[in-house]
Design a protein with these regions (language model features):
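N-terminal leader/targeting segments and the first structural element of proteins
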Residues: 1-2
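Short aromatic-glycine-(Arg/Gly/Cys) micro-motifs in beta-strand/loop hairpins
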Residues: 6-32
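Mixed-charge, Lys/Arg-enriched low-complexity segments
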Residues: 33-76
Length: 76
C-alpha cells in the first residue's frame, strides 16, 4: 500500500493510503480501517468515527481529525 496523506493525533499517526486495486484506506498502526473509492470518503468516515475500530478501541471521532483531505499533510 502506498501511503499518500498523514495526520498526527494525540494517540498516534493516521495515514490515508492507496492499495494496488486503486482503493483508499485509512490506516493506523499498519492496519487498514476500511476501503473507499476516494481519499475524501476515507477522511470523512475516519473523522466521523465510521471506520473499523483501531487497535486500542478508541473513537476516532474524538481525536480532532479533519474531514477535509486538504488539511492533511502529504507523505514525502
Amino acid at each position: 500500500m502506498k501511503l499518500l496523506y498523514v495526520y498526527e493525533t494525540r494517540v498516534g499517526t493516521f495515514f490515508i493510503g492507496q492499495s494496488p486495486d486503486g482503493r483508499f484506506h485509512p490506516v493506523f498502526d499498519g492496519e487498514s480501517l476500511g476501503s473507499y473509492l476516494s481519499p475524501q470518503h476515507a477522511t470523512d468516515d475516519l473523522a466521523g468515527g465510521h471506520t473499523f475500530s483501531p487497535a486500542g478501541g478508541f473513537d476516532t471521532a474524538t481525536l480532532g481529525i479533519p474531514e477535509d483531505i486538504s488539511e492533511w499533510d502529504t507523505v514525502k
